[in-house]
């Protein structure tokens, strides 16, 4: 069984809709050996807004022009579907519900079928196994685990750090990924035809996201 760690970056989230500008991933084996790592740039067909809610700037991993040279989401949809729906692969993300939201809303924007896959959230795993920690952000968690951080917000690197967090929790708890998932069912999400389910909620994105289309600029 292999593991796929992925992360998504967006050019902006105007209108409540994240316009994907990159999807990065790391494919690893059960011992966390990296088999493949790639950052797939996406033309967001929307301008970049590089400010957080607190006013701090966000540094892009590449010049803006590189993103606008890339294929758009519709062109890359088959590749993303192949990655996320591959058999014999367990999918992980950090705060993965956000990435799921971005994917589904782009499916609405580009009139593509919804993805169907399962995913596990390393943020929830960290919260479950490290209840004494107050950190939720990937960078801060890496700091507490003494994982070197160089290039946050390049999608493939964030995916790599997500893998390192999962690996570190396994080491601390003297178990493997399957052991973590068995003990923490709350980290599980299923995505099927625009409906996202986890331990606490069932969320239908279908009607909610359809209303975002008019906000796309």
Where in the sequence are the language-model features?
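Substrate-recognition/cap helix-loop segment adjacent to the acidic, metal-dependent catalytic center
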Residues: 99-120
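Short, amphipathic alpha-helical segments that act as regulatory/interfacial helices
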Residues: 104, 163-170
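Short, glycine/acidic-enriched loop or turn micro-motifs at the edges of active sites
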Residues: 10-12, 124, 161
């Amino acid at each position: 069984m292999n593991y796929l760690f992925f992360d998504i970056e967006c050019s902006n989230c105007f209108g409540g809709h994240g316009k994907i500008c990159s999807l990065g991933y790391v494919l690893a084996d059960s011992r966390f050996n990296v088999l493949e790592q790639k950052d797939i740039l996406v033309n967001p067909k929307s301008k970049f807004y590089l400010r957080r809610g607190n006013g701090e700037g966000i540094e892009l991993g590449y010049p803006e022009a590189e993103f606008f040279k890339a294929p758009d989401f519709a062109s890359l949809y088959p590749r993303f579907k192949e990655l996320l729906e591959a058999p014999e692969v367990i999918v992980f993300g950090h705060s993965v519900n956000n990435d799921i939201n971005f994917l589904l809303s782009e499916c609405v924007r580009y009139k593509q079928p919804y993805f169907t896959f399962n995913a596990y959230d390393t943020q929830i795993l960290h919260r479950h196994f490290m209840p004494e920690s107050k950190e939720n952000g990937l960078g801060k968690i890496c700091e507490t685990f003494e994982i070197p951080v160089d290039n946050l917000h390049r999608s493939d690197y964030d995916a790599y750090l997500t893998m390192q967090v999962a690996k570190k929790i396994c080491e601390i708890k003297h178990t493997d990924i399957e052991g973590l998932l068995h003990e923490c069912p709350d980290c599980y999400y299923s995505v099927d035809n625009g409906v996202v389910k986890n331990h606490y909620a069932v969320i239908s994105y279908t009607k909610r996201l359809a209303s975002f289309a008019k906000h796309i600029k």
